[in-house]
């Protein structure tokens, strides 16, 4: 229906493209202002008239042609307000949303997107800060896949660097094989924290750490064996968390994968005369771009993560021939990626324009940024299990006879954490507030999941029923139903905008809006009635709503329990 209005406006406005008309067309917040509204401000220059006069003339022009899809078309100030013929509108919407792939797009067909996300630092616990990149990245993967893109999910593990030199020193001085095998990453974290405490008093420990990392880079057998052991232990924990979240990756190619590929970066920089020596190290100067220099090699000849990121980009372009490469990391890495992308540009690659940094805000509980070095860390697994346990307690209190309580608790608990992370713009900080996150009545994951379960319960109460292809659309013209149907039609556009802006929160907000509109419909419109026409039409509305909610939550990585 929106496309029909765009076509009608396009017929009557030669001075504006269809794309611009589509972008300008609005859904008014108040129903008494119509179903759609078109502002005429942008036409003032072309028409050389006041916007309200343009609106008046165009309204008269449209009414004169007598389009049967409108109940009426009026102008209010500089706006043209369209009131649709409700039965025709209801039919059009139901035909649109009642499709298996509603919301899916084709703009990504034949295109590849690489998304680099999660990427925890090996030998360190997976904390809630890592949850943000994992949750946002997974949602972007699903959103881009929905639009037809082929997506490569890359977990660029932080499995190389001087921190491993520190950890090897710490292990040799204060660790034991038995303790590490028994306690895993917790033990590695314990000795890593001790290293930093001791290094503040004895700087020679840092020198020893650098020496061990150089040994790693030179292929020292002992150093690499210890490093690989640390990595294997870490991956067991990380994969356990990904399984709990219901997520996976196509590649676990961390920084170490590129350690033998950094020479290509150095050679290309030398060929372009971009590599300069500075205090013994090698850098790319970015002064003229108002950026700090990009460090390529340290004094001791060891590589740095910028070098490995550059090597990774060259490898990914060659291997996947991506149309876009997205990095989902904290805001504190903004400069790092600006430098890396600028170096790619200076190397003469025009695909630097297809490199995107998607930053996000911090995570805290009762205030305070998370830190690894002093041991003041909130672990992801701890948070996830706590959410599951708290939901389990709520279910035991409110619905103790619920089947599959354990599985429902997992779905709702994990879903609550994911939804809380994705409900606001990613750049905003996330603060854990259990009462808010687990609220079944607020703008939360459990609320949307409960709405889905409510839809499912309608069909359980009705029993086995085969929904007809056509229904009596005249019974779907009340305000509650129309508002719900109009909201559902936004889904494809919301997905596109979420992809364009790298903002999954748009999907989360849409899901809440649909849930709210459905619950108003559920309250106002009795469904299981004797009149078969009314019953079937309203069941059809429940069915399409249920499918859209499930699809929207899936784009956020959230499952939908049938009962709650």
Language model features with spans:
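Non-catalytic interaction-recognition regions
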Residues: 1-90, 99, 104-564
């Amino acid at each position: 229906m929106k496309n029909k209005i765009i076509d009608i406006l396009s017929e009557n406005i030669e001075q504006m493209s269809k794309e611009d008309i589509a972008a300008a067309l609005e859904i008014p917040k108040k129903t008494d202002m119509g179903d759609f509204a078109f502002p005429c401000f942008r036409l003032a220059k072309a028409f050389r008239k006041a916007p309200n006069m343009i609106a008046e003339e165009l309204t008269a022009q449209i009414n004169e042609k007598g389009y049967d899809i409108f109940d009426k078309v009026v102008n209010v100030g500089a706006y043209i307000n369209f009131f649709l013929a409700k039965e025709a509108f209801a039919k059009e919407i139901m035909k649109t949303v009642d499709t298996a792939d509603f919301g899916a797009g084709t703009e990504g067909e034949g295109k590849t997107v690489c998304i680099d996300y999660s990427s925890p630092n090996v030998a360190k616990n997976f904390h809630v800060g890592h949850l943000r990149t994992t949750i946002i990245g997974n949602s972007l993967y699903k959103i881009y896949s929905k639009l037809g893109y082929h997506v490569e999910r890359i977990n660029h593990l932080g499995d190389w660097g001087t921190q491993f030199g520190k950890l090897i020193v710490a292990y040799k001085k204060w660790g034991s094989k038995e303790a590490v095998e028994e306690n895993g990453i917790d033990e590695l974290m314990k000795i890593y924290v001790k290293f930093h405490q001791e290094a503040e008093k004895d700087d020679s420990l840092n020198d020893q750490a650098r020496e061990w990392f150089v040994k790693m880079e030179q292929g020292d057998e002992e150093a690499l064996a210890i490093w690989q052991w640390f990595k294997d232990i870490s991956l067991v924990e990380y994969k356990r968390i990904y399984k709990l979240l219901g997520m996976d990756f196509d590649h676990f190619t961390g920084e170490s994968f590129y350690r033998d590929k950094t020479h290509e970066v150095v050679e290309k920089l030398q060929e372009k005369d971009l590599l300069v020596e500075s205090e013994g190290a090698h850098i790319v100067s970015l002064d003229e771009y108002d950026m700090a220099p990009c460090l390529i090699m340290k004094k001791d000849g060891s590589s740095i993560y910028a070098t490995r990121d550059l090597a990774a980009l060259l490898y990914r372009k060659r291997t996947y021939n991506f149309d876009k490469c997205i990095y989902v990391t904290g805001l504190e890495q903004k400069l790092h990626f600006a430098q890396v992308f600028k170096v790619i540009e200076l190397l003469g690659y025009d695909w630097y324009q297809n490199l995107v940094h998607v930053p996000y805000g911090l995570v805290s509980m009762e205030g305070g940024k998370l830190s690894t070095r002093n041991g003041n860390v909130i672990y992801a697994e701890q948070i996830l299990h706590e959410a599951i346990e708290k939901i389990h307690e709520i279910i035991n209190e409110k619905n103790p006879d619920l089947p599959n309580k354990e599985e429902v608790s997992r779905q709702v608990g994990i879903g609550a954490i994911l939804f809380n992370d994705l409900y606001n713009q990613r750049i905003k900080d996330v603060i854990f507030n259990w009462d808010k996150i687990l609220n079944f009545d607020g703008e939360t994951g459990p609320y949307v999941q409960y709405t889905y379960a409510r839809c499912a319960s309608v069909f359980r109460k009705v029993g086995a029923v085969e929904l007809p292809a056509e229904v009596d659309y005249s019974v779907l013209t009340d305000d509650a139903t129309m508002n719900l149907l109009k909201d559902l039609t936004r889904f494809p556009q919301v997905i596109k905008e979420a992809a364009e802006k790298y903002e999954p929160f748009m999907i989360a907000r849409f899901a809440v809006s649909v849930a709210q509109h459905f619950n108003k419909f559920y309250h106002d419109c009795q469904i299981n009635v004797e009149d078969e026409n009314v019953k079937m039409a309203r069941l059809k509305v429940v069915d399409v709503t249920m499918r859209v909610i499930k699809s929207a939550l899936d784009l956020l990585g959230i499952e939908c329990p049938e009962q709650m």
